[in-house]
Amino acid sequence: MIATEQKKQIISNFARKAGDTGSTEVQIALIDARIKELNEHFKTHKKDFHSKTGLLRLVGKRKKLLDYLKRTELERYKKLIETLGLRK
């Protein structure tokens, strides 16, 4: 799990206004942090297939949110992709 301090930092970095915890950018950033954490977990636990299922679910959720953001607000999408270092 992501530490509370790390969550607060991610929320403050991607929030659109004070107290914003549910915007699309914040949700994508939190899911991305969890995905990166799971990838580190898999480096030592190669046969943890149950967690791999959860990882695939998170990747799908992030993709859906990214598609939504791209469809609704392209500039915010491009900025987020660049900040998170997702697509090349």
Swiss-Prot record:
Pfam families: Ribosomal_S15 (PF00312)
Keyword flag Transport: no
Keyword Glycosyltransferase: no
GO MF, one annotated term: structural constituent of ribosome
InterPro entries (alphabetical): Ribosomal_uS15, Ribosomal_uS15_bac-type, uS15_NS1_RNA-bd_sf
Domain of life: Bacteria
PANTHER family on file: RIBOSOMAL PROTEIN S15, BACTERIAL AND ORGANELLAR, SMALL RIBOSOMAL SUBUNIT PROTEIN US15M
Cited function: One of the primary rRNA binding proteins, it binds directly to 16S rRNA where it helps nucleate assembly of the platform of the 30S subunit by binding and bridging several RNA helices of the 16S rRNA. Forms an intersubunit bridge (bridge B4) with the 23S rRNA of the 50S subunit in the ribosome.
Assembly mode: Part of the 30S ribosomal subunit. Forms a bridge to the 50S subunit in the 70S ribosome, contacting the 23S rRNA.
Entry protein name: Small ribosomal subunit protein uS15
